[in-house]
């Protein structure tokens, strides 16, 4: 039971656990919570006061959500943080995906540890203006499973919010776990009083993913978190033709033969201009209209599509920004366009 919440099994005329008469009034007689309410400390939760003080130095707070796992939410969170840092903003990235912390890998910070100073826990820094906090920095090894129930997860989220010293930062990006679970309720409860800019929801095009995204949108509306928009990730596979592998199927044996060199040689000889085109294919069924149609139906902004790009996957594996080295020629422009809709007043640097 959180401070101030009336328990579901309370008596009909419950005065509320924060009332001076909590556990003492006539209406409390026979209530299963009578003793707990009578002895509970009254007044504001001191942790919420501490969180408000910490968050007072954070200008903007953005939640990154998804209905399902595996849709690229953490990849988007990482690249959003890289992009904001590339705009010369001071950025913090908080990973509250307690059971699946992939942010340390995607920021190139595996093996790093949290340090403590007289100001609190210090984030692990990728760059001078990009700090990261994750439970991944607290595990003895990256294969260690986190088997925690809700209260312990909520306790760590609260500790991240009240004990991590970010300093004066422009953006705090919060990478949440998929779905709508204890972690989501906690982060909203703790952050909403301090001001949340809103949530970006990441999905893939197929209906099986969008079903859960609708629930995510509904959650945001119920708890009062603005939906900044929905990103359709993995919107078709796109890559330069010269990077495509060509296979000849041997139907009799079920095996296949790599004929890539033969195909590229043939194109180079007979149609070299085709080597510069981009090959695209639909990976997920978007016949239902995808995220764009869902956004129209639910009245939330559609931020855009990000194609499935092997180079973006490689950047995530290597913990690098997709906006550097001009390698993510397919995905980087799409991500840049989406991020500029969220942060319209700032132009991204190349």
From Swiss-Prot:
It is found in: Cytoplasm. One of its GO terms (cellular component) is cytosol. Residues 1-30 are annotated as: Disordered. The keyword Metal-binding applies. GO terms for biological process: iron-sulfur cluster assembly. Keywords: 4Fe-4S, ATP-binding, Cytoplasm, Iron, Iron-sulfur, Metal-binding, Nucleotide-binding. [4Fe-4S] cluster binds at residues 14, 28, 31, 37. One of its GO terms (molecular function) is metal ion binding. Changing residue 322 to G: Seems to promote [2Fe-2S] cluster binding in the C-terminus. Changing residue 28 to G: Impairs [4Fe-4S] cluster binding. Binds 3 [4Fe-4S] clusters per homodimer. Contains two stable clusters in the N-termini and one labile, bridging cluster between subunits of the homodimer. Pfam families: ParA (PF10609). Its cofactor is [4Fe-4S] cluster. ATP binds at residues 67-74. Belongs to the Mrp/NBP35 ATP-binding proteins family. NUBP1/NBP35 subfamily. Homodimer and homotetramer. Predominantly homodimeric. Component of the cytosolic iron-sulfur (Fe-S) protein assembly (CIA) machinery. Required for maturation of extramitochondrial Fe-S proteins. Functions as a Fe-S scaffold, mediating the de novo assembly of an Fe-S cluster and its transfer to target apoproteins. Essential for embryo development. Although plant and algal NBP35 proteins lack the characteristic CXXC motif in the C-terminus, thought to be required for Fe-S cluster binding, they can bind a [4Fe-4S] cluster in the C-terminus. Also, in this linage, no CFD1 partner protein homolog as found in other eukaryotes can be found. This is Cytosolic Fe-S cluster assembly factor NBP35. It comes from Arabidopsis thaliana (Mouse-ear cress). The lineage of its organism: Eukaryota, Viridiplantae, Streptophyta, Embryophyta, Tracheophyta.
């Amino acid at each position: 039971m959180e401070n101030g919440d009336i328990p579901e099994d309370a008596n009909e005329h419950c005065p509320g656990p924060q009332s001076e008469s909590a556990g003492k009034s006539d209406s409390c007689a026979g209530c299963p919570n009578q003793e707990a309410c009578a002895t509970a400390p009254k007044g504001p939760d001191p942790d919420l006061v501490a969180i408000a003080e910490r968050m007072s130095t954070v200008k903007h707070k953005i939640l990154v959500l998804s209905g399902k796992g595996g849709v690229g939410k953490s990849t988007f969170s990482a690249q959003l943080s890289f992009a904001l840092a590339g705009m010369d903003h001071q950025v913090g990235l908080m990973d509250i995906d307690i059971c699946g912390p992939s942010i340390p890998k995607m920021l190139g910070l595996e093996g790093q540890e949290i340090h403590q100073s007289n100001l609190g826990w210090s984030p692990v820094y990728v760059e001078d203006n990009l700090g990261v906090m994750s439970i991944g920095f607290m595990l003895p090894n990256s294969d260690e499973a986190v088997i925690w129930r809700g209260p312990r997860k909520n306790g760590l989220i609260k500790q991240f919010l009240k004990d991590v010293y970010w300093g004066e930062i422009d953006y705090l990006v919060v990478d949440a776990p998929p779905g709508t679970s204890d972690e989501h309720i906690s982060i909203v409860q703790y952050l909403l009083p301090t001001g949340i800019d809103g949530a970006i929801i990441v999905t893939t095009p197929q209906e099986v993913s969008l079903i859960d995204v609708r629930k995510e949108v509904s959650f945001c509306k119920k708890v009062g978190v603005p939906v900044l928009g929905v990103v359709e990730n993995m919107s078709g596979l796109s890559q330069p033709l010269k990077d495509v592998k060509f296979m000849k199927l041997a139907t009799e044996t079920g095996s296949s033969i790599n004929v890539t060199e033969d195909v590229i040689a043939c194109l180079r000889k007979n149609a070299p201009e085709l080597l510069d085109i981009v090959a695209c294919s639909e990976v997920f069924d978007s016949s239902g209209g995808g995220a764009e149609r869902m956004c129209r139906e639910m009245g939330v902004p559609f931020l855009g599509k990000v194609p499935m790009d092997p180079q973006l996957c490689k950047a995530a594996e290597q913990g690098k920004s997709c906006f550097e080295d001009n390698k993510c020629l397919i995905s980087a422009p799409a991500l840049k366009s989406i991020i500029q809709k969220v942060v319209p007043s700032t132009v991204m640097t190349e």
